[in-house]
């Protein structure tokens, strides 16, 4: 596409140049792209222009600064405010995909993937954009919600491949930072709101308002709200013009624990939901409501609820053992995961391995220590992603919430902690490895190292 068309309604240029893509990140930049140099959290994109040129960018857009470089540079005042226009101008077929957004502290990934699984069973082409990457595309992401150009590029690819529906995890950061700007969602789904990300939002009110953006104006045409969450009235009020649909666990006529999950009745259907944890009842009901809003009926949807499977790293049982991996990295998620194991193994001792991320919400650390003390019989504290923080200082914050009489070990090396716990695990003990779930790296200092809870645990089981 000619750069004049990309810059339409933004800035005039006499430049004639063919462009193959837009990029905010030199790590994902491809030959023929325009590099958009913005101020980031720590550095300005200008610092990466030479690297972008080396990788084949054909032009640079710069925010309010003149910069001489080996490719054409175009100054765009208030560049960040024009990102959605740039994306819409270039990725013109992205708008052809029907979009569903899922927001909430916990459950975004599970609900998104349950919707996708149901649509797969119903032979409806779909994709998921979120924590586990972007399905049915080669694009990858390290964020729950990727940057705006990556999203539009993926939607363009979906459209070209006749993928008609995309489910997007809408994080609070993405909603605040405009990464979903210009998109229109047929549905917005709210799962729950509990403490997280207060390093960024500062207060729970700010955090709630960030999530609420999904339901304002014409961002979402329909709203599907979890009425079991104590914040549900705020989201109902925010989405009142959309005739919101509410859901809750009491939509089930009954449910009871089974060996593999739950025996449930929904409307006139009795089935086994093969997912553990009451939170997964809520997640599955959210997915059911979403797919029903797409025009499918109970006869089509409910039989497939019995075939759902958890996403990687979400209450994932390893090799039919008593060892479970979960992404739980918030107080509420840790509470849910440990409570689930307590219910699943009523006669067992429950052990948990976890830590907390560095340079992130410090207020939740003591809370998570307290929850582990109350829900588990023994605790191993270890590194999560310490980033730039002192690992022992993070552990000390968690310890402030534990009880003196608790059985607590500290093994900072996460691999050693997992191996030690598995090697000493008794026949009537269950182990939860919490915090990283599906992740395949660990961030220590400023470097990202290959690391997988799942791989380390499976290796220790051999």
Residue ranges and their predicted role:
Residues 1-85, 89, 230, 250, ...:
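N-terminal leader/targeting and accessory segments in enzymes
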Residues 13-22, 82-85, 146-149, 168-174, ...:
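Short gly/ser/thr-rich secondary-structure transition/capping motifs
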Residues 3-5, 63-70, 161-164, 176, ...:
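Acidic, Mg2+-coordinating active-site environments of NTP-dependent enzymes
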Residues 19, 32, 57, 70-71, ...:
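Short, well-ordered alpha-helix to beta-strand connector turns
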Residues 58-64, 223-227, 353-354, 377-385:
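Short internal beta-strands
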Residues 1-15, 31-34, 44-47, 243, ...:
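ATP-dependent carboxylate-amine ligase
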Residues 64-66, 131-132, 172, 193, ...:
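Short, ordered loop/turn segments at secondary-structure junctions
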Residues 83-227, 231-242, 292, 345:
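Phosphate-binding loop of NTP-binding sites
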């Amino acid at each position: 596409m000619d750069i004049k068309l990309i810059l339409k309604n933004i800035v005039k240029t006499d430049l004639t140049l063919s462009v193959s893509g837009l990029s905010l990140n030199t790590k994902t930049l491809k030959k023929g792209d325009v590099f958009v140099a913005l101020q980031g959290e720590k550095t300005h994109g200008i610092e990466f222009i030479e690297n972008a040129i080396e990788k084949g960018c054909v032009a640079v857009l710069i925010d309010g600064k003149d910069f001489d470089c080996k490719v054409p540079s175009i100054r765009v005042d208030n560049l960040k405010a024009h990102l959605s226009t740039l994306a819409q101008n270039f990725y013109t077929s992205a708008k052809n995909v029907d979009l569903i957004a899922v927001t909430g502290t916990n459950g975004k990934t599970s609900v998104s993937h349950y919707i996708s699984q149901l649509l797969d069973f119903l032979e409806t082409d779909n994709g998921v954009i979120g924590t586990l990457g972007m399905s049915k595309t080669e694009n990858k992401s390290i964020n729950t919600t990727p940057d705006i150009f990556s999203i539009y590029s993926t939607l363009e690819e979906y459209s070209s491949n006749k993928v008609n529906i995309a489910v997007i995890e809408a994080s609070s950061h993405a909603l605040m930072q405009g990464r979903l700007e210009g998109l229109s969602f047929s549905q917005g789904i709210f799962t729950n709101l509990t403490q997280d990300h207060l390093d960024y939002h500062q207060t729970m009110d700010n955090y709630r308002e960030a999530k609420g953006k999904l339901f304002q104006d014409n961002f979402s045409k329909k709203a599907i709200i979890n009425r079991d969450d104590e914040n549900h009235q705020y989201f109902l009020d925010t989405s009142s013009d959309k005739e919101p649909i509410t859901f809750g666990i009491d939509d089930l006529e009954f449910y009871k624990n089974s060996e593999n999950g739950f025996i449930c009745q929904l409307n006139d259907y009795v089935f086994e939901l093969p997912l553990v944890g009451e939170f997964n009842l809520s997640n599955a009901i959210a997915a059911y409501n979403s797919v029903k809003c797409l025009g499918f009926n109970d006869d089509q949807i409910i039989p497939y609820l019995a075939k759902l499977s958890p996403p990687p790293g979400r209450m994932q049982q390893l090799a039919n053992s008593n060892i479970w991996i979960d992404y739980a990295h918030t107080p509420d998620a840790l509470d849910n995961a440990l409570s689930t194991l307590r219910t699943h193994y009523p006669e067992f001792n429950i052990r948990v391995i976890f830590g907390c991320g560095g340079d992130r919400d410090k207020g939740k650390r003591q809370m998570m220590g307290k929850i582990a003390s109350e829900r588990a019989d023994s605790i191993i504290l270890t590194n999560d992603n310490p980033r730039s923080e002192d690992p022992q200082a993070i552990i000390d914050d968690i310890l402030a919430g534990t009880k003196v009489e608790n059985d607590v070990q500290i093994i900072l090396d996460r691999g050693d902690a997992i191996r030690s716990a598995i090697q000493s695990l008794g026949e009537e003990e269950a182990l939860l490895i919490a915090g990283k779930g599906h992740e395949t790296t660990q961030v220590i200092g400023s470097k990202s190292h290959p690391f997988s809870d799942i791989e380390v645990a499976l290796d220790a089981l051999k």
